[in-house]
UniProtKB/Swiss-Prot annotation:
Organism expressing this protein natively: Arabidopsis thaliana
Listed name of the protein: Mechanosensitive ion channel protein 5
Polar residues biased stretches: 115-145, 864-881
Keywords of this entry: Ion channel, Ion transport, Membrane, Phosphoprotein, Transmembrane, Transmembrane helix, Transport
One annotated Gene Ontology cellular component of this protein: membrane
Function: Mechanosensitive channel that opens in response to stretch forces in the membrane lipid bilayer.
Entry keyword Amino-acid biosynthesis: no
Gene this protein is translated from: MSL5
Membrane-crossing residue ranges in chain numbering: 265-285, 309-329, 349-369, 387-407, 642-662, 677-697
Length: 881
């Protein structure tokens, strides 16, 4: 290993990429150093005061600077080797000069000289000593610093470490010279943890380059229209490449999933069937064979033991038959199938266990009667009976608890989120449909072509004329086009996507007829799906293409809106009209889609900015709804665990009462302990109960809602059982206990209807009435022209008068939105203020303070009315001595 000169005072920044454990990047600069090693702290030794021959100059410089020196371990051991090898030193100096001038030169002579000097074969390149390219570096500070390290420069530094050393020493010294410093990543991790869920990822560096724009919107394939939900995933290879996985859609025609229809023959069910056959056979033999009829065991007939074993082993099998009969009866009733079947399948295991234990208890009670207890003279039978009763009571209580929790959770989600889920899925359907080909127009064209082909065919039959071969080929092509499978499935009832839902079925749903199965499926679509463009619904697409179509940020939403606008509008058109929507949607869907845009119902057109705002708003709504459902699901699970603890305590108390353990003295001790627990945890239990009532009964907000509490506007960030996290206007997180929020008035902007606003300005009292009338007319015409912003005909009133000098005029107008998006509100308000100011300048309406008449009646007397000794302070320096 080559010795290191003390004049090598280069500054190193060594950065480690957290994603690649073995990646190290280093940079350095030096003008007169020869060493190129990367050191770590354990490879430094303090200089002992002796001066080498080759570092005299560097020592003088360090003494002048008052600094101390470092020497790498093993330096003295290899100093003679370096002195005996002057070409190596010259080559090193040459390489450093080239590096300082900005050139990078790779010399293979270094490797050859190292081989000749060490007389060892060259070390093969491995994962540990081969430099890596493309390293992402992180400096000591929390901000990331990107440094490019050229592989050949690192290779030269590594090769110089092998000069003059043996193979063993070479490996050891290379292990010593690896890393200088490792930057801490804790600040960056802490920032990632505190990031808001409602904020978007950073905007790409080059916003003009969009991966969705680079992909063609006219990808070939069969379009699956009318489906909403998760994007299809790439499946197994088929005849035409990768085909999507076909999953059953069990929710289209009925409300029962296919997985519950299929009978599952497990290993235990198979054993139960074998046991049933064997035990029934032995029971028949014991009842028919004379020798076995008199056989007893513990003074009990053999057939009674066989019946007991039959109930214990095969009781679950018999109880499953009873459950199947109950389910069959429920399925036959339409109302029960909509409302009850979900809960029946949810608790079928608990019902099966209850029936099984009930059969066991009946068999035990009637077979092991009082006579057997007297003959055996044992009290164990009594305790066995009590234990069976305890288990049966526990299962019944647990069954009731499960049913209540499922019913309450389903009714809560259905009454609170069904309308929002339905609207969000329809918005997703509109976005996906408008981003694809005009299917309705294509369908109409194919129907016309099909009709023409049929007319020509019928005419040929009636007239008896023969068509030319070219015309026959054209007619056949028309008939083939008319049978396109992708278009015939627009109104079909059956699909292939198990996680999707058809738009016609979605429109028929409401809070009265939606089943619990469908409600659960809709929630899963929101939680697991994402808004995307139409490209993902084509066949023969890869996972990369599907990811490129998903909308995961507001920037991607704006790109999707731009793509939709160019796809829907005619060439050269600046607006989207209802006729453009009719090329993609049916008439009912097109009218409903037009009503989603602000001001489109009055102006009958949609601008590009209006479309962009709508897509961004749809993305925000979808993200907030997904976060709300996720937090609500988490809260329900935690509430379920709390109820499990409470029910467990109740079951234990009931067990003690049934087993007779709870005597009077025991109850007295237990009551005293309960009083102590109530004194300690009573306030906490009260807080938890109030928080549960606030979250599930009152439920004044959801994630993403803008609220006003104590005069401060806050945005809901996260909802928990005990607390709610808010974001203030400056993104400061504020945590409120739910029990405290239950006692405060909460204003919810999101749930409010279209809200009003007021703009006030003052004019002088002497302003002519003609100008005031003119400014009123200008304001009214401006607001009426902005139909997508405000409702027409705002109120303009004289609000107040200030000391007979000015009159305050107020403009009361109503936005076509609520104040959930406060930034958009102030943007529109600013536009109106600019218009008011522009109008005032054009009409020469200014607020000028007219001169006031001041009458001076008397002045205070002075000692010398003609002169005064007072002078300004600045004149003091100008006076002479």
């Amino acid at each position: 290993m080559a010795a290191v000169d003390s004049t090598d005072r280069r500054d190193f920044i060594v950065n480690i990429n957290g994603q690649e454990s073995g990646a190290v990047g280093a940079t350095g600069s030096s003008s007169n150093a020869e060493g190129g090693n990367i050191w770590k702290e354990s490879s430094y030794d303090f200089w002992d005061g002796e001066k080498g021959k080759n570092d005299k100059k560097g020592d003088d410089e360090d003494e002048d600077g008052g600094s101390f020196h470092f020497r790498q371990r093993g330096e003295r051991r290899h100093s003679s080797a370096e002195l005996s090898d002057p070409p190596s030193k010259l080559i090193g100096q040459f390489l450093h000069k080239q590096r300082a001038s900005g050139d990078e030169i790779s010399l293979d002579v270094e490797l050859n000289m190292a081989e000749l000097q060490s007389n060892t074969p060259p070390r093969p390149a491995t994962a540990s000593n081969t430099p890596r390219r493309g390293l992402t570096t992180i400096s000591e500070s929390s901000s990331p610093v990107k440094t490019k390290v050229k592989a050949d420069a690192v290779r030269r530094r590594q090769n110089r470490t092998s000069l003059g050393g043996s193979s063993d020493e070479e490996g050891r010294n290379r292990d010593e010279a690896e890393v200088l410093k490792c930057g801490s990543k804790k600040p960056m991790l802490s920032r990632n943890k505190t990031k808001s869920r409602l904020q978007d990822p950073p905007t790409p560096t080059h916003p003009a380059i969009d991966k969705t724009e680079m992909k063609s919107g006219r990808r070939s394939g069969i379009f699956k229209s009318g489906f909403l939900g998760k994007s299809p995933k790439a499946g197994t290879p088929g005849r035409n490449g990768f085909e999507e996985e076909e999953e059953e859609d069990p929710f289209l025609d009925e409300d029962l999933p296919e997985e519950f229809k299929r009978d599952k023959l497990s290993f235990w069910v198979f054993l139960e069937w074998i046991s049933l056959v064997l035990i029934v056979t032995s029971l028949v033999c014991s009842l028919t064979i004379h020798n076995l009829q008199r056989k007893t065991w513990w003074k009990l007939d053999l057939w009674k033991w066989e019946v007991t074993v039959l109930v214990l082993i095969c009781g679950r099998l018999v109880s499953s038959w009873i459950v199947r009969i109950i389910v069959f009866l429920v399925e036959k009733n339409f109302t029960w199938r909509k409302r009850v079947l979900y809960f029946v399948y949810g608790v079928r295991k608990s019902v099966q266990n209850c029936l099984w234990l009930g059969l066991v208890l009946l068999a035990w009670h009637f077979l092991f009667d009082k006579k057997v207890e007297r003959e055996t003279r044992s009290t164990a039978l009594r305790y066995v009976t009590r234990v069976l009763v305890c288990l049966l009571v526990a299962l019944i209580i647990w069954l009731v608890k499960t049913i209540l929790v499922k019913v309450l959770a389903s009714s809560f989600h259905m009454s609170t989120y069904f309308d929002r889920i339905q609207e969000s899925l329809f918005t997703q359907y509109v976005i996906e449909t408008l981003s694809g080909p005009p299917l309705m127009e294509i369908q109409r064209m194919e129907e016309e072509e099909q009709q023409v082909a049929e007319d020509v065919k019928s005419l040929e039959k009636l007239a008896g004329a023969k068509l030319p071969p070219a015309l026959k080929a054209t007619v056949k092509s028309f008939m083939k086009v008319g049978k396109s499978p992708g278009l015939n499935r627009i109104g079909s009832k059956r699909g292939e996507d198990g996680e999707g839902i058809r738009i016609d079925q979605l429109k028929r749903m409401n809070t009265k007829n939606v089943s619990a199965w469908n409600m659960k499926r809709l929630m899963n679509i929101i939680l697991k799906g994402a808004i995307s463009t139409l490209d993902q619904n084509m066949q023969d697409t890869t996972q990369e293409d599907e990811d490129a179509t998903h909308i995961r940020s507001e920037y991607e939403a704006k790109c999707a809106a731009r793509k939709i606008f160019h796809n829907v509008t005619e060439p050269g058109s600046r607006y989207i009209y209802l006729e453009d929507f009719l090329r993609f949607l049916c008439e009912e869907e097109a009218e409903r889609a037009m009503a989603l845009f602000e001001g489109a119902s009055e102006s009958d057109k949609i601008s590009k900015s209006c479309l962009k705002n709508w897509v961004v708003k749809a993305f925000r709504e979808r993200r907030a709804l997904a976060l709300t459902l996720n937090d609500t699901k988490t809260a329900v699970d935690r509430l379920h665990r709390i109820i499990n603890v409470v029910i467990g305590i109740i079951i234990i108390i009931i067990w003690l009462l049934i087993l007779g353990i709870a005597t009077t003295r025991f109850l007295l001790v237990l009551s005293s302990q309960l009083l102590l627990v109530a004194f300690v945890f009573g306030n906490s239990c009260k807080t938890i109960f109030e928080a549960i009532i606030f979250l599930f009964v009152m439920h004044p907000f959801d994630v993403g809602d803008r609220c006003e509490i104590d005069g401060v506007q806050l945005v809901v960030e996260e909802m928990n059982i005990l607390t709610t996290v808010f974001l203030r206007y400056d993104n400061q997180k504020i945590i409120y206990p739910n029990s405290v929020l239950g006692t405060k008035p909460i204003a919810n902007y999101y749930r409010s209807p279209d809200m009003g606003d007021a703009v006030e300005f003052c004019v002088h009292i002497a302003t002519p009435p003609e100008k005031i009338t003119a400014i009123k007319q200008r304001i009214l015409s401006y607001v009426d022209n902005k139909k997508d912003y405000w409702y027409p005909a705002p109120m303009i009133v004289f609000l107040s008068m200030d000391d007979l000098n000015s009159v305050k005029i107020a403009v009361w107008l109503t936005h076509r939105m609520n104040h959930q998006d406060m930034g958009e509100r102030y943007i529109r308000r600013g536009l109106l203020l600019e218009e008011v100011g522009k109008t005032c300048r054009e009409l020469d309406i200014e607020y000028r303070l007219y001169p006031l008449n001041i009458n001076v009646r008397s002045l205070p007397p002075t000692a010398n009315p003609t002169s005064s000794d007072r002078i300004p302070p600045s004149w003091m320096q100008q006076r002479g001595p």
